[in-house]
Every structure is written in structure tokens, then in C-alpha cells.
């Protein structure tokens, strides 16, 4: 079996379902949760749309299956923290077990893992939103639709998925958005037909060479420095694992 065949089998086994299946899951979740969201939002709901890795086509098994972005109108005078907290409480009162995450509320709808991400839309004709960041008890501004389009237009989903799987195999603290942006930088100028082995090796080489001083900017807001989400120790651990992976003789020792 060639290296690319091995990596393709990993993707078949661990990457998430097709775009049609993801959309079907999203519509099922949306149908179950919209009555709760509509009542909670009290007339201030702007829109709801699929977001995160499920919308980007980069999801892997074992993580959130469906990400739902909940856009609240700019005219709502409730604070971002209150929006975040009351959404969680509304879902909990509806009978779901919830998890408070950094910018999202995690829950299960049947056997589907769901992340709900509430944000308040900026005034005017814009897709920019402000999100509550619970770990910092602060907020951030971003453009989720632009983030999604940036990844979908890159045609690098398979390499992003492989890098996520590699991260999980080695239990690294390597946030998904960092992975997305590093893969895009690593493969800048490479053909879309680049083989899985050549492309993934280039990603690992880039991580080894660049991650310690990488400067990754949120495509949805240049003021958000995504690389700051990792500590130096986390970056060092990822760099060392990339170096170790590049020294392995067999792909089965790198990702499985």
C-alpha cells in the first residue's frame, strides 16, 4: 500500500460524513432546536446558519458533528455574556445536558454532538459579529461566514483533516483554527493535485520550521491574532512531535 493510499484510508475511516449527510444532520438539529432558540431570542433573532468545521468540510469523527451559529440582531441591548449564559440556560431547561465551552454551548441532540455559537451582529449591512469569550470573560469580533468561505475556497480540506487527526493521535493542544491557517500557509503555491503524502509532509515540515514564530491572523478580523491562542509550550510540543513524525520510517507511526 502506498503512503497516499494509507492516508486516504485514514480519511475514509476518521473524516466526517459527506456534505449532503452533514446538511441533513444540520437540518435535523435545527428542526429540534429552533423552537427553543425562537422563544429564547424574544424577537431578536437575525438568522441561524451552519458554521464551524461542519460547514467548512473539515470535520473529523469524535468532535462536534454540527456547529450552529445563532445571530442576534444588533438592536438587542442584552450583553454578550448574558446572551451566552441565557442561551445555555434555555437549552438546559428544555431537557438537554449542556457544556459551557469557550464561545459555544455544547450538547447532544440524539446521537449528534452539537455546538451552539451565539453572536450579536454589528450594526449595518455586515456579516461581522461580536462573540462572548468565556475563558477570558471578554469578547471578540469576527466574520464567521468569511472564515467558512476562506477554507472552502482553499481546497485544502483533506490536509486540514489529516492534521487534525494527527493532532488527536498525539494528544496535542493544537486548536483547529491554528491548524487551518497553518495548512493554508504551508501549502501556499502548491498544486491542488498535490498527493496526500507530499502535501502532509510539507505541512509537517512547515510546522517544524515555523510554528514557534508563526503569526496567524483571523481571516474574519485582522485584529484577532489566532496564533496567540497557543502557549509557547504548546507550540514547542507540536513542533517536537512534527520533527519526530518526519523521522519515522512508516506512516503508521505518524498517524493512525
Residues covered by each model-derived region:
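N-terminal regions immediately upstream of nucleotidyltransferase
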Residues: 1-49, 53-63, 76-78
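Generic non-transmembrane alpha-helical segments
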Residues: 32-43, 86-94, 162, 166, ...
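Glycine- and acidic-residue-rich phosphate-binding/metal-coordinating active-site segment common to enzymes
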Residues: 100-101, 110-161
Amino acid at each position: 500500500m502506498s503512503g497516499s493510499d494509507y492516508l486516504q484510508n485514514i480519511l475514509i475511516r476518521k473524516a466526517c460524513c459527506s456534505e449532503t449527510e452533514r446538511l441533513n444532520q444540520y437540518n435535523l438539529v435545527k428542526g429540534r432546536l429552533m423552537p427553543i432558540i425562537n422563544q429564547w431570542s424574544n424577537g431578536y433573532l437575525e438568522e441561524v446558519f451552519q458554521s464551524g468545521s461542519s460547514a467548512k468540510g473539515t470535520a473529523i469523527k469524535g468532535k462536534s458533528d454540527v456547529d450552529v451559529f445563532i445571530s442576534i440582531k444588533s438592536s438587542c441591548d442584552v450583553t454578550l455574556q448574558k446572551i451566552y449564559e441565557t442561551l445555555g440556560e434555555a437549552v438546559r431547561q428544555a431537557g438537554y445536558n449542556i457544556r459551557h465551552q469557550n464561545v459555544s454551548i455544547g450538547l447532544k441532540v440524539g446521537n449528534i454532538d452539537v455546538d451552539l455559537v451565539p453572536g450579536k451582529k454589528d450594526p449595518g449591512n455586515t456579516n461581522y459579529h461580536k462573540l462572548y469569550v468565556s475563558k477570558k470573560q471578554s469578547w471578540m469580533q469576527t466574520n464567521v461566514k468569511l472564515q467558512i468561505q476562506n477554507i472552502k475556497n482553499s481546497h485544502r480540506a483533506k490536509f486540514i483533516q489529516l492534521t487534525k487527526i494527527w493532532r488527536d493521535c498525539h494528544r496535542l493542544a493544537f486548536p483547529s483554527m491554528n491548524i487551518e491557517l497553518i495548512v493554508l500557509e504551508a501549502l501556499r503555491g502548491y498544486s491542488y493535485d498535490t498527493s496526500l503524502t507530499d502535501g502532509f509532509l510539507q505541512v509537517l515540515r512547515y510546522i517544524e520550521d515555523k510554528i514557534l514564530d508563526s503569526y496567524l491572523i483571523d481571516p474574519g478580523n485582522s485584529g484577532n491574532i489566532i496564533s496567540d491562542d497557543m502557549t509557547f509550550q504548546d507550540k514547542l510540543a507540536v513542533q517536537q512531535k512534527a520533527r519526530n513524525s518526519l523521522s519515522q520510517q512508516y506512516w503508521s507511526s505518524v498517524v493512525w
